[in-house]
């Protein structure tokens, strides 16, 4: 499989730079897989998981929104905030979700509530994707 260059950058640091086979992105209009030879594209990103695949190696990163551009055989991901899944604080995320849930009950109907619900849903999806599976 042909590889391509990927850079994942946040305001804090360069989190990833390397040759990969595939990248899966959380686009605001749905998840998107990018392979070498993909048509040029610019995508707004929602909070979620970015997965890079190079052979048998998968790296996962949590992002809290951003922008991705694929052109001239390179993918650049500009994340609002990002961290490696390995270094992500799941307890802190759960606390943020609990705070969001409490504040949702106090908000009135309108655009602000719609944005808050969308953010809440994205954070819950991240938590679900990262939390260890539990038996019922």
From Swiss-Prot:
Gene Ontology molecular-function annotations: ATP binding; proton-transporting ATP synthase activity, rotational mechanism
Matching SUPFAM superfamilies: Epsilon subunit of F1F0-ATP synthase N-terminal domain
UniProt subcellular location: Cell inner membrane
Keyword Cell membrane annotated: yes
Topology with respect to the bilayer: Peripheral membrane protein
Keywords: ATP synthesis, Cell inner membrane, Cell membrane, CF(1), Hydrogen ion transport, Ion transport, Membrane, Transport
Gene Ontology cellular-component terms listed: plasma membrane; proton-transporting ATP synthase complex
InterPro entries per the UniProt record, alphabetical: ATP_synth_F1_dsu/esu, ATP_synth_F1_dsu/esu_N, ATPsynth_dsu/esu_N
Function, as annotated: Produces ATP from ADP in the presence of a proton gradient across the membrane.
Quaternary structure note: F-type ATPases have 2 components, CF(1) - the catalytic core - and CF(0) - the membrane proton channel. CF(1) has five subunits: alpha(3), beta(3), gamma(1), delta(1), epsilon(1). CF(0) has three main subunits: a, b and c.
NCBIfam families reported for this sequence: ATP_synt_epsi, PRK13448.1
Family membership noted in the UniProt record: Belongs to the ATPase epsilon chain family.
PANTHER family linked: ATP SYNTHASE DELTA/EPSILON CHAIN (PTHR13822), ATP SYNTHASE EPSILON CHAIN, CHLOROPLASTIC (PTHR13822:SF10)
Protein name: ATP synthase epsilon chain 2
């Amino acid at each position: 499989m042909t590889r391509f260059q990927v850079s994942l950058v946040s305001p804090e640091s360069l989190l990833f730079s390397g040759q990969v086979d595939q990248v899966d992105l959380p686009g605001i209009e749905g998840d998107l897989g990018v392979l070498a030879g993909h048509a040029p594209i610019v995508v707004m990103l929602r909070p979620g998981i970015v997965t890079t695949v190079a052979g048998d190696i998968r790296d996962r990163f949590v992002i809290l929104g951003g922008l991705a551009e694929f052109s001239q055989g390179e993918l650049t991901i500009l994340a609002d905030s990002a961290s490696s899944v390995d270094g992500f604080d799941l307890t802190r995320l759960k606390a943020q979700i609990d705070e969001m849930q409490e504040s949702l009950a106090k908000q009135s109907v309108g655009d602000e509530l719609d944005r808050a619900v969308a953010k809440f849903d994205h954070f819950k999806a991240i938590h679900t994707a990262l939390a260890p599976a539990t038996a019922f």
